[in-house]
Structure formats: C-alpha cells, structure tokens
C-alpha cells in the first residue's frame, strides 16, 4: 500500500534517507515535498507520535536531516530545506492518520471520479481494512458513511474547527510546550493554513 507522505520518485528517495534520521530522534515524517522554482525547496513536515512538536525540535530535525543529505547528496542543484509541524489543519498522509483523527472534519480528494465526484467533505469515521471511512451529506439532513480505498486518494486534509483547535491545545498542554498566544492568533485567522512550529529555512 502506498501513502501520501512522498508522491514522486525523488520524494520517495529523499524520504528513504530522512525517515530513519527523523524516527531515530523520536519523531515521525508526516510529509515530504521537493518543490521546484528558481531555487528548489525541500519541505519536510514532522511531528511527535502523540503530536505537539515545537520550533526547537524542528530546528534539531533540520540540523540532523541536513547532515544526512550532505552525505548522500541526492539533490544536484542548490536547495532550501524547510522543516515545520503539520499545522492544525494538517494533511492526512498515512492510513493510520484517518484512524487517529476519527470524529474530526476533513476534505478528501481522489485521483479518479467516484460516483461522479473527486472531492469529499465530511466527518472521518475511522478505517476498515484498506479503506478510509467518511460520513458525508446525502441530501438534506441525511448522511451516509462511505469507504474510499486509501490508494485512491490524491490529497486529504483536516478542516479547521473549534473542536480541532481544542484538541491541539490539549496536545500542547500534554507536551508541556503550551503557548496560548499561538492559539489566539490562529482563532483570529481561522480558515487559513497555519503552521504551529516552523524552523527558518536552511540553504544548501
């Protein structure tokens, strides 16, 4: 079974290099993308297994990953390394994410049309085998839970809600790295993507 952590061949190669480094530090790789542009950017999202990664930890990951990439040297041209948290409205990139975030709202996009549509919005209802379960509207005041094979997914992301913010607050408090001011800012800019912890870019 594939996942959405690394999509392209070069992304998967880079993930093979950095995943052991990140996991060896006690974190998890959530997503990796090598972005094109005038200067290429390697974007890495990482988190604690129980959530709540902070800026200093992103900095530690950046230093360790940078050293590993300097040894392997898989990117020929100059690039910028960015390490951040997944943010509150985080991407869902692994099958287990849909189980962990059961009960929260999400948007899912599939690679092919399913019953005439590619986009689904609803409440996550866990997993069943290799399927992601999501409860969606089926007409006025009517809901149905459908199963989407994980391999069909092109993109998936949590929707920013008060319930989700409350859960992130709980994770922050549990980790001992709680800064209430961060969440004041998030509530003011609700609907915009917000990274909770981001390490300043490192150029290579």
UniProtKB/Swiss-Prot annotation:
Compartments annotated for it: namely: Cytoplasm
Sequence similarity: Belongs to the RimP family.
What InterPro entries is this protein classified in? Ribosome_maturation_RimP, RimP_C, RimP_C_sf, RimP_N, RimP_N_sf
- Which species is this record about? Cereibacter sphaeroides (strain ATCC 17023 / DSM 158 / JCM 6121 / CCUG 31486 / LMG 2827 / NBRC 12203 / NCIMB 8253 / ATH 2.4.1.)
Task: Describe its function.
Answer: Required for maturation of 30S ribosomal subunits.
> Which protein is depicted?
Ribosome maturation factor RimP
The record's Gene Ontology biological-process terms are:
ribosomal small subunit assembly; translation
Give the region (Disordered) as residue ranges: 176-204
- What residue spans carry the Acidic residues bias annotation? 181-198
Cytoplasm is among the record's keywords: yes
What's in the keyword line of the UniProt record? Cytoplasm, Ribosome biogenesis
Its cellular-component GO annotations read:
cytosol
Family matches, as CDD domains: YlxS_C (cd01734)
């Amino acid at each position: 079974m594939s996942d959405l952590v690394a999509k392209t061949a070069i992304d998967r190669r880079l993930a093979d290099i950095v995943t052991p480094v990140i996991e060896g530090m006690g974190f998890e790789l959530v997503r990796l993308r090598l972005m094109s542009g005038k200067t290429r950017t390697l974007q890495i999202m990482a988190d604690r297994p129980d959530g709540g990664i902070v800026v200093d930890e992103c900095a530690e990951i950046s230093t360790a990953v940078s050293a590993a990439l300097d040894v392997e040297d898989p990117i020929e041209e100059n690039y910028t390394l960015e390490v951040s948290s997944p943010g509150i409205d985080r991407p869902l990139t692994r099958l287990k994410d849909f189980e962990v975030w059961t009960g929260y709202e999400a948007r899912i996009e599939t690679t092919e049309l399913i019953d005439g549509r590619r986009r689904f919005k609803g409440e996550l209802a866990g997993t069943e085998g290799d399927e992601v379960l999501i409860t969606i509207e089926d007409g006025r005041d009517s809901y149905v839970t459908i199963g989407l094979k994980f391999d069909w997914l092109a993109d998936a992301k949590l929707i920013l809600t008060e319930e989700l913010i409350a859960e992130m607050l709980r994770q922050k408090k549990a980790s001992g790295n709680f800064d209430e001011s961060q969440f004041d800012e998030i509530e003011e800019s609700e609907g915009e993507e917000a990274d909770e912890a981001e390490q300043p870019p490192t150029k290579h």
